[in-house]
Regions:
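Beta-strand elements within well-structured catalytic alpha/beta cores of enzymes
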Residues: 15-21, 70, 179-189
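Active-site signature of alpha/beta-hydrolase-fold catalytic machinery across serine-
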Residues: 83, 192, 196
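Short glycine/proline- and acidic residue-enriched helix-loop micro-motifs
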Residues: 116-159
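Loop-to-helix element that buttresses phosphate recognition and phosphoryl-transfer chemistry
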Residues: 18-83, 150-165
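Glycine-rich phosphate-binding loop signature in dinucleotide/nucleotide-binding domains
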Residues: 59-65, 171-180
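Acidic, low-complexity terminal tails and accessory targeting/binding regions
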Residues: 1-16, 52, 98-110, 173, ...
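Short hydrophobic/aromatic-enriched beta-strand-loop microsegments
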Residues: 40, 87-94, 201-210
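Phosphate-coordination/substrate-recognition cap region in phosphate-metabolizing enzymes
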Residues: 3-12, 51-120, 124-131
Length: 232
């Protein structure tokens, strides 16, 4: 852990909050919004999860204690945790990806075509999308696997941020007790978790890039919540 210790006067003693994004899926390749649909990792995603686990073990050779690893219940996150070598996890519904509502399973261009203008989830959220876009269907993946897609009303960025704050509220006592905590989840919700850790506007998560199967580290410096490392 010495690589991650802050140094100098005011260096903090609490543990670190480590964020690990899941590996690649067919929909992360195609650009389809993947919120609550239970898309599995593809072959490349499984390879990425193995490699991501190696990097994470190199950074945290002592690992994470029992009760200090949390995963989204969605398959792509659970598979990543297991392949990365962190199978002793607790699932948290609050770590599920942002619910994109009517945009679920669609590409950004498709959503824009319905609205008649470019759409950005950070700017407008799912709440501006028409109810006629909602529905249920079955999507066939490139490997011929099938996933059930549910496209409901979705959630606002503020609702996603409220979930993120609940996660932070759960892990903060563990960190203050000196434990390192690992969260395995999804790009948007982990970026929103980061904004709430920094006490920032959740919309500012758009300025953080977190690649598949990469990790980031949050912590304290002089009692302030900070980003220690990003997108490793």
């Amino acid at each position: 852990m010495t690589d991650y210790l802050t140094s100098g006067e005011g260096a903090s003693k609490p543990g670190y909050l480590v964020l690990l994004r899941h590996g690649q899926t067919a929909w992360s390749v195609s650009g389809q919004y993947t919120g609550r649909t239970d898309v599995p990792l593809n072959e490349e995603g499984r390879r990425q999860a193995l490699e991501g686990g190696k990097r994470l073990r190199g950074a945290f050779p002592d690992g994470f204690g029992r009760g200090h690893i949390f995963s989204s219940p969605l398959r792509r996150a659970r598979e990543t945790a297991q392949l990365a070598g962190y199978s002793d996890f607790e699932t948290l519904d609050d770590l599920m990806e942002w619910d994109y509502g009517p945009a679920e399973g669609r590409r950004r261009e498709e959503v824009g075509a319905v609205l008649g203008h470019d759409w950005c989830v950070w700017d407008e959220g799912p709440e501006v999308l028409p109810a006629r876009m909602q529905g249920d269907w079955v999507c066939t993946l490139p490997d011929s696997g099938k996933v059930d897609v549910h496209s409901g009303a979705g959630e606002t960025v503020d609702e996603a941020a409220a979930r993120a704050r609940r996660v932070i509220g759960k892990v903060t006592p563990l960190m203050l007790a000196g434990h390192n905590v690992l969260l395995v989840a999804h790009a948007h919700i982990l970026r929103i978790v980061t904004t709430q850790w920094l006490r920032a506007d959740p919309h500012s998560g758009r300025f953080l890039r977190l690649d598949t199967a990469h990790h980031s580290v949050l912590g304290y410096y002089k009692d302030d919540p900070v980003i220690i490392h990003w997108n490793i």
